[in-house]
Swiss-Prot record:
GO BP terms, alphabetized: actin filament organization; apoptotic process involved in morphogenesis; embryonic camera-type eye morphogenesis; lens fiber cell morphogenesis; microtubule-based process; mitochondrion organization; negative regulation of apoptotic process; negative regulation of gene expression
Residues bound to Zn(2+) 1: H100, E102
Cellular component annotations (GO), alphabetically ordered: cytoplasm; cytosol; nucleoplasm; nucleus; protein-containing complex
Native organism: Camelus dromedarius
Residue positions the entry lists as glycosylated: S162
Binding site for Zn(2+) 2: H107
Protein name: Alpha-crystallin A chain
Positions of region (Required for complex formation with BFSP1 and BFSP2): 1-63
Residues with the N-acetylmethionine modification: M1
Protein's UniProt keywords contain tRNA processing: no
Length: 173
């Protein structure tokens, strides 16, 4: 078995072109050394590698599931309360907007805002859509699918966000 050994100077040749955490969903949670200078760490210490597991944990969760019977969106919004969230259905899209004003945390003052837009499948029953926020900050937007050939009814409407007292059963991958 041959193992190719790559010289450390070439390890991050495309470093500036790799995406960083700066534009991830939870960019407001703080920056790490590798976020600001991702290629510098490998230049100074060629054997230093950031933890891939840490990067996965830092990126948050946004998952869409569409099976035969229902359509579900899981979105990690742990920094927002139901009052900070707006969920609207506009024709074939669901728009989720979260915004909270400046508040104090461990590192000073911070304000956060995000806007997500997802396309709804054409066979989702828009009159039966629901949205809930679990105790651990997982927003679950769901709607049943209807048999093909039946009109799903497209209109603009707001979906209220209800609060659940139990943690989410969404995957934590």
């Amino acid at each position: 078995m041959d193992i190719a050994i790559q010289h450390p100077w070439f390890k991050r040749a495309l470093g500036p072109f790799y995406p960083s955490r700066l534009f991830d969903q939870f960019f407001g949670e703080g920056l790490f050394e590798y976020d600001l200078l991702p290629f510098l760490s490998s230049t100074i210490s060629p054997y230093y590698r950031q933890s891939l597991f840490r990067t996965v944990l830092d990126s948050g969760i946004s998952e869409v599931r569409s099976d035969r019977d229902k359509f579900v969106i899981f979105l990690d919004v742990k920094h927002f309360s139901p009052e900070d969230l707006t969920v609207k259905v506009l024709e074939d899209f669901v728009e989720i907007h979260g915004k909270h004003n400046e508040r104090q945390d461990d590192h000073g003052y911070i304000s956060r805002e995000f806007h997500r837009r997802y396309r709804l499948p054409s066979n989702v029953d828009q009159s039966a859509l629901s949205c809930s926020l679990s105790a651990d900050g997982m927003l679950t937007f769901s709607g049943p699918k209807i048999p093909s050939g039946v009109d799903a009814g497209h209109s603009e409407r707001a979906i209220p966000v209800s609060r659940e007292e139990k943690p989410s059963s969404a995957p934590s991958s």
